[in-house]
Amino acid sequence: MLLSRMKPAVGGEASTSSNEKKRKNKSKKIPRLEDYLNQRDYLGALTLLEFQRNSGVSVEHADLWTGFCAFHVGDHKRAMEEYKALTLRPDCPVDVWVYLGCALFFLGLYKEAEEAALKGSKTQLQNRLLFHLAHKFNDEKKLMGFHQNLEDVTEDQLSLASIHYMRSHYQEAIDIYKRILLQNREFLALNVYVALCYYKLDYYDVSQEVLAVYLQSIPDSTIALNLKACNHFRLYNGKAAETELKNLIDISSSSFQFAKELIQHNLVVFRGGEGALQVLPPLIDVISEARLNLVIYYLRQDDIQEAYKLIKDLEPTTPQEYILKGVVNAALGQEIGSRDHLKIAQQFFQLVGGSASECDTIPGRQCMASCFFLLKQFEDVLIYLNSVKSYFYNDDTFSFNYAQAKAALGNYREAEELFLLIQNEKIKSDYVFQSWLARCYIMNQKPRQAWELYLRMETSSDPFSLLQLIANDCYKMGQFYYAAKAFDALERLDPNPEYWEGKRGACVGIFQLILAGRESREILKEVLPMLRSTGNPQVEYIIRIMKKWAKDNRVAL
């Protein structure tokens, strides 16, 4: 069956009158620059301006608008070139110098930006630019001067909020953004800024809620989707974060190219450092966090020297930078036995943990715990760790530090439980872990487990140190059988007279426990070979006494 057509497939235009065609053509408006600007379609406006320039169409202030649009699409180099060309003209408006300063600022040319801005007229834009430059130059006096010139208008208040954010005063920034939002509900992008502040305050769930408001209206925002991925990383894991980031890559919006480096950087973080050496080094001067994450990568690889080289010349300005410098100095101090580096680390931790903005945050309290840990003030360590332990359920690194503090204060039972919760193989193979666990076993009357821990250790210098610990701790605790075994093993490795004295005392101690009925008589069979392995004249005298007692008490040797 053939279906008849209501309209012809081709040639339908023939029925349209020429008058109707003219009417339709007239209804198609030629795009105007004002329309693009009103819609904030700066890329469209820039395209139109370029077309008009190439076509020889004269537009009033075309060069100014070209610089303006280039700036707003993120092409700051193009904006700089346009504004520089304008400054060479004798009739150049004085405000152009400030616009040039803004472009130079975003290119990281701060000195040149200041020089250009000072040639411009004294406007609120100039004040805001100089305000931000004072922050970049760490010039507190100038910063406060420009701060006083700010007015209670949206642009100035947003500028102030930005400075608060960069100085880690996140709550102050939130207060400003919320106040502006109450007056201007249509300023949806401010929700992203608020969400960023909550992210920095570690309130990842709150950040996610605020961000959702913006994403409902602008679902393909690069910055918002990237922040959502970062929240997922903090709330869940790297896999969940990577899924969110892949959604961003799939969208490939017009701003995707601009955020390419950011996405590459974050993928490395979400994947636990995979590809760090290929991706992060070129981004060190592009993304501030790239240097910090590369330092973290080196720390995880136990390459403390490389981590130190990368961060030693960094002048910290944020809590994260102070913390990381503290961690690197602490690790280096422990590795090379440098008290100076440990002292620097302690000072960095104290600076962050004692600051008004960080003292009640989780990282701030961890810093104070680290500070007191280095000072060996373990009661204070526990005060701070107890206050944040609910946030670190099943966190092996936290459990490791918490257990050490407990053990240092003699809470061996709790410390043992914490040590045994740890699943991370790297931590479990660390001598510090093994020595503390062995001590806990011994103090909790479990010397056999401590001995088995030694037997499982691979051949290195560490087993010798662990043997010394087991020998001495078992001796102190009256666990003479395992003390004797440890001193015997030490003596075979190093014929030091002190080890013989320890073994002799432990063997006599075992004999005393047997006499008191607190140790099995059968152990005497193991004691005699240990004594005979030493060529000391005292050996025969001790063995003779033990043999006589065994004979009198019908103990087979």
Swiss-Prot record:
GO terms, molecular function: intraciliary transport particle B binding
Record keywords: Cell projection, Cilium, Protein transport, Repeat, TPR repeat, Transport
InterPro entries registered for this protein in UniProt: TPR-like_helical_dom_sf, TPR_rpt, TTC26
Biased composition range(s): Basic residues: 21-30
Gene null: resulting phenotype: Defective cilia. Morpholino knockdown of the protein results in cilia defects in the pronephric kidney at 27 hpf and distension/dilation of pronephros at 5 dpf. In the eyes, the outer segments of photoreceptor cells appear shortened or absent, whereas cellular lamination seems normal in retinas at 5 dpf. Left-right asymmetry defects with abnormal heart looping, hydrocephalus, pronephric cysts, abnormal ear otolith formation and curly body axis.
Keyword Repeat (UniProt): yes
KW Repeat (keyword) present: yes
Segments for region (Disordered): 1-30
Entry-linked SMART domains: TPR (SM00028)
One GO CC term on file: ciliary base
Biological process annotations from GO: axoneme assembly; cilium assembly; intraciliary anterograde transport; intraciliary transport; intraciliary transport involved in cilium assembly; photoreceptor cell differentiation; photoreceptor cell morphogenesis; photoreceptor cell outer segment organization
Subcellular location: Cell projection, Cilium
Domain of life assignment: Eukaryota
TPR repeats: 60-93, 95-128, 154-187, 471-504
Function: Component of the intraflagellar transport (IFT) complex B required for transport of proteins in the motile cilium. Required for transport of specific ciliary cargo proteins related to motility, while it is neither required for IFT complex B assembly or motion nor for cilium assembly. Plays a key role in maintaining the integrity of the IFT complex B and the proper ciliary localization of the IFT complex B components. Essential for maintaining proper microtubule organization within the ciliary axoneme.
Family that this chain belongs to: Belongs to the IFT56 family.
Self-association and partners: Component of the IFT complex B.
Identification of the protein by name: Intraflagellar transport protein 56
Record organism: Danio rerio (Zebrafish)
